[in-house]
Amino acid sequence: NLFNPAIGRLIDLWGFQVGESERRRVPPERAKIEALVKTRPSMDDIQIDGILLHGGNPDLKLDFGYIARGYAIDLAIDRLRDLGIHNALVNIGGDLRAIGTRGGPPWPVALRNPIGGGVLAILQVSGDESVFTSGDYQLNFTYKGKTYHHVIDPRTGWPAEGTRLVTVIHQDATGAAAAANALMIAGPDLWQQTAQAMGVRSCLLIDALGRIHMDPSMAGRIELLDRNAEIIPIPSPAPGDDSLSPGS
C-alpha cells in the first residue's frame, strides 16, 4: 500500500515534521533507513481490541500527518452544513474542499507550477469536490546538489522519485489527501492503477521531466495557462477494457 500511515518512524527519521529551524539538512544514514524498511511496518500489523490498539511490529508508529489537513477540512465542511451553510470553500494551505457554488458560478482554483512557480492551470470546482496537491517543492532540502522532499516511499524509505507534483479531485478531502500522497509515490508508471484502486477519477501528474500526465476527466476540466507545456494525455479506456484494473 503506497499510502502507509504505519511508517511514522521513517517519517521521524527524515525529520520533515519539525519546524524549519530544526529541520535536518542532510539525509539520514542509509543503514538506519534500510533497517526500518526491512521490518515493513504496515496497518496490517495492528490488532483492534475494543478501544485498544496493539501493534505486532516494534517499528510500527502511526503518523497521519499526510491526511490531517484533509480530515480537518472535512470536519469544517460537516460543521458548516450543520449550520445550514450549503455554499462554501474551506482552504488550508492551498488544499481545499468546496460545496455548492460561488453565488452561481463554480469556484475557480489555481494550481501552482512546481517548475519556476506561478500558476500552472485553473480548475472550476462546484457541487462537492476536494482538490489536493502533493509536490516535491512543499518541504525539502538540498544536499550535495540533490533535493530531498517530504513524501517518503514506504517501499524504499527514501523520498519518492520521478514525480514533481500530483493534483487530484475527489469528493472528501481526507480521501483526496491520501490519494495525492499515494500517487506522488506511484509515479508516472503506476499512477493510473493507483488512482483507479483508490476510486479517484480526476488526476494530474507532472513527472521529473516537467511533462504533464492527465486522465480524460482532468483534461476535460482544466485550463492550462502554460501554452508550452508538454502534455501526455491518457486515452479513455474502450468499453470492457480492464487493462488498468489493479492486478492486471
Model-derived regions: residue spans:
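Mature catalytic core of soluble alpha/beta enzymes
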Residues: 1-248
